[in-house]
Amino acid sequence: MGKRNFKTPVIYAALFIIISCAIAFAAMKYLSPTASTADKDELQDLVQLSATEAAASPVEDSDSLIEIFAYGCHYCAINEDNLSKMAARLPAGKSFRQLHLSLPGAASSRTDTLFATLTVMGIEKQYREKIYHAINEEHIDLGTQAVRDMWLQKNNIDVAAFDKASTSAQTQALLNYMAKISAYYKVRGTPTFIINKKWVALQDRTYPAFSDHLLSLVEKDLPLEK
């Protein structure tokens, strides 16, 4: 009896693992890590809260547009420029703020402390593009402390100063604020937009049409037809 060739099954198994990993990574990159495919099918593009629900909202500013984003969100990264242009069109008295998703157990929430700490340090916007690139292009896990500390050092951010800021009252308050908003509005995908406490919008059209839609909600309390 001839010897069996064990190489072929091993090769097929290795190929299967590689292909499976590639598919899983693509799904994580292009689908929000906070929502399963089934959940995404159930999400509505626009939800209006009742007056009672809006009044109980943890959002501090009633005349505001808030984006709930995540560093690991591909669509958040590519739309930064569009959001800057939209923010420049906001009328006087209206504010725009970006907050990181913060939900227990959500994979994309693992960098909420990084966002909050750098924000309190006053340097978050300066490093945001680099963080997007590190996570989405270089696949660096900045949610792991040791890896994050190495990245901080590489980018000339004082690790001791970061650690001190991360335990400050200001950082904890910001984390609590983000967690309350993420939970209250049941944010299940990023980016999610909260308008004047009462509207929750997901992107349902391309920019700049989506900017017009958000600005209409901010200024006129009126959604635009697609």
Locate each region found by the language model:
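Solvent-exposed, acidic/flexible segments
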Residues: 62, 72-79, 104-111, 120, ...
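Extracytoplasmic thiol/disulfide redox context detector
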Residues: 2-106, 179, 220-226
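Tryptophan-centered motif/residue detector
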Residues: 70, 86-87, 138, 151, ...
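Structural microenvironment flanking redox-active thiols in thiol-disulfide oxidoreductases
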Residues: 90-120, 124-153
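C-terminal cap of thioredoxin/glutaredoxin-like
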Residues: 2-24, 154-226
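Alpha-helix capping and helix-coil boundary motifs
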Residues: 5, 33-39, 139-144, 205-210
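Residue-level detector of secondary-structure transition/capping positions
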Residues: 81-84, 91, 122, 135, ...
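Extracytoplasmic/secreted proteins, especially bacterial periplasmic and envelope-associated proteins
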Residues: 78, 82-85, 109-113, 126, ...
